[in-house]
A protein has these predicted regions:
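Bacterial Sec-dependent N-terminal signal peptides
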Residues: 1-29
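Extended soluble regions of mature proteins
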Residues: 24-270
Length: 270
């Protein structure tokens, strides 16, 4: 799947055409994929970035998933091992040597303007449900070329952060990475104003049917709460796992004190 000029992708945020899906279980069959490199920092005082590969899979039923390809592959190998008769320990050994990606992913549901934020903490998946807010974009006059596409610049706020983004009207999809969407074209690059987070599009294209997205929230124990609650739980887990284990009922963590941990949340809770 490589970026090709002139590819026409459905504009999925035509809300009127999605009303029939708003109150039912949506199909996870995806028809289009956009691949992003996600650069992020855990400590703003250190140079360089950590990186993960994230897929934006756009489903026919009017929603989209944004998830770590590395984590999804690791989980799929584990599930395949279990399906072939391995026990949990054996399946864990199979994936031990595989790289680890980030645990969080999101499901944007346009018909009812909801976002579902999933993150696996210990052995449970925490699902936070919130309003899918349309960022208030200001389109500025700058242009640039990215991957051969003419891109326009816009500035807006999403998830409590200010973002500078570049979108291309050549790809008629008002989508983008994470909670960034609603512009007249696909967002190819986004960076927050602090410089701690960046999304850069690498590839985009159609998926050979049928392709169904299967993620950790589909087969693990899930705890549901509001979006802010899930983000707070994730932040506590990253900064103070010992406290997290106690507060959320996983038991007391034994062993020596944990060294200070650094973490910058992507989503800023009010």
């Amino acid at each position: 799947m490589y970026i090709k000029r002139g590819i026409i992708i459905l504009i999925i945020a035509v809300i009127a055409g999605l009303k029939g899906y708003s109150q039912e279980i949506l199909s996870n069959e995806a028809s289009y994929r956009v691949e992003y490199s996600y650069y992020y920092k855990r400590d703003s005082t250190k140079a360089g970035y950590l990186m993960d590969t994230y897929f934006l899979d756009i489903c026919k039923s009017g929603h989209s998933f944004f998830y770590s390809r590395i984590t999804q592959y690791r989980d799929s190998v584990k599930q395949a091992s279990l399906a072939h008769g391995m026990d949990a320990y054996q399946a864990s050994e199979v994936i031990r040597s595989l790289p680890r990606g980030l645990a969080w992913y999101i499901d944007k549901r346009y018909a009812d303007r909801k976002v579902m934020y999933y993150t696996q903490l210990v052995w449970d998946v925490f699902r936070g449900i919130g309003e899918l807010e349309l960022p208030k974009w200001e389109i500025v006059g700058d242009t640039t070329i990215l991957n051969g596409f003419t891109c326009n610049k816009a500035i807006g706020v999403a998830g409590g952060r200010e973002w500078i983004v570049w979108y291309t009207p050549d790809i008629q999809l008002n989508e983008g990475p994470w909670l960034l969407w609603g512009l007249p074209g696909l967002i190819l690059k986004a960076e927050d104003s602090t410089g701690c987070f960046k999304f850069i599009c690498d590839n985009v294209g159609e998926l050979a049917p049928p392709y169904y997205v299967l993620l950790s929230g589909d087969y693990n124990n899930t705890r549901s709460m509001d979006l802010a609650g899930a983000v707070r739980a994730e932040t506590m887990y990253e900064l103070d796992p010992k406290k997290f284990m106690s507060v959320y009922g996983f038991g007391e963590m034994q062993g020596p004190p944990i060294p200070k941990r650094y973490y910058i949340p992507l989503y800023l809770v009010k």
